[in-house]
Amino acid sequence: MGKKELKRGLVVDREAQMIGVYLFEDGKTYRGIPRGKVLKKTKINAGDYVWGEVVDPNTFAIEEVEERKNLLIRPKVANVDRVIIVETLKMPEFNNYLLDNMLVVYEYFKVEPVIVFNKIDLLNEEEKKELERMDSIYRDAGYDVLKVSAKTGEGIDELVDYLEGFICILAGPSGVGKSSILSRLTGEELRTQEVSEKTERGRHTTTGVRLIPFGKGSFVGDTPGFSKVEATMFVKPREVRNYFREFLRYQCKYPDCTHTNEPGCAVKEAVKNGEISCERYKSYLKIIKVYLEEIKELCRED
């Protein structure tokens, strides 16, 4: 049977031995049953695009799994188009270093981040000006930034439109309102409230991930990504510079420039000229410093 005769679906539920497949042809979710080489060789995850056939009114036989463009580990979802990094200017207070770490990590996993500032209904005029400054910094760095209030609904329609056709997950610090945003998008709540990079656990932890449809062809995971993460968990010291996307616009004197103390560093010159945000550059230096401190600690243990 050729692929043209098979039907295309998306794995939207993966827990233990249970697989749920959303069939694009009819918008119905079926119980997925792998067979043939898929059964023997392929580890199926939420977010996988699959091909197969409906064998009864409730069952979809999976014949093939498409090659993935990415696979996250928190949560374990394939083919993620956008990670919605939720932040707030206050309650909790914004920490650009934590955001910059998270941006490095998702750049490493080849997932496009979008920064969403929630709780804008709480801001006074001075705070709104500061939010506009943060907006400008991250837009200039090359990121999309949206501003919403999950409480009032302001900006939610724009977020839904922006995410049209994408597979998404939510990430961001504790208390920023990830569950409230998910509820606005889908009418449902997050099953796992937070995930820590240390414990790898959250309240009401589940072993699987469910992708919930919303908007026009969009899906969002009901289990969040990292609430806090250090880039050092994944990225090698020399690679950090490659994940600050605004740095890539500049040509330094030396190809292996670390943008720290080398002469002829175009990145440092750009910081000096105001072309690169001082806050972003300080985050970069702090991440490098974390590496150095970790190496020193390892040497002490040895």
Swiss-Prot record:
The EC code for this enzyme is 3.6.1.-
- Name the InterPro entries on file: G_CP_dom (IPR030378), NA-bd_OB-fold (IPR012340), P-loop_NTPase (IPR027417), Ribosome_biogen_GTPase_RsgA (IPR004881), RsgA_GTPase_dom (IPR010914)
Question: What is the annotated localization of this protein?
Answer: Cytoplasm
Q: Which GO terms describe its cellular component?
A: cytoplasm
Subunit relationships: Monomer. Associates with 30S ribosomal subunit, binds 16S rRNA.
- Record carries keyword RNA-binding: yes
Enzyme class, UniProt record, top EC level: hydrolase
Cite the cofactor comment.
Binds 1 zinc ion per subunit.
The species this protein was found in: Aquifex aeolicus (strain VF5)
Name recorded for this polypeptide: Small ribosomal subunit biogenesis GTPase RsgA
Q: Which co-factors does it depend on? A: Zn(2+)
Q: What is the lineage of its organism?
A: Bacteria, Pseudomonadati, Aquificota, Aquificia, Aquificales
- Locate the CP-type G domain: which residues? 69-229
* Predominant place of localization: cytoplasm
Molecular function terms from GO: GTP binding; GTPase activity; metal ion binding; rRNA binding
The record's function comment reads:
One of several proteins that assist in the late maturation steps of the functional core of the 30S ribosomal subunit. Helps release RbfA from mature subunits. May play a role in the assembly of ribosomal proteins into the subunit. Circularly permuted GTPase that catalyzes slow GTP hydrolysis, GTPase activity is stimulated by the 30S ribosomal subunit.
- Any GO BP annotation: ribosomal small subunit biogenesis
PROSITE patterns referenced in this protein's UniProt entry, alphabetically = ENGC_GTPASE, G_CP
Keywords, A to Z, come to:
Cytoplasm, GTP-binding, Hydrolase, Metal-binding, Nucleotide-binding, Ribosome biogenesis, RNA-binding, rRNA-binding, Zinc
Q: Where does GTP bind?
A: N118, K119, I120, D121, G172, P173, S174, G175, V176, G177, K178, S179, S180
Family, according to the entry, reads as follows:
Belongs to the TRAFAC class YlqF/YawG GTPase family. RsgA subfamily.
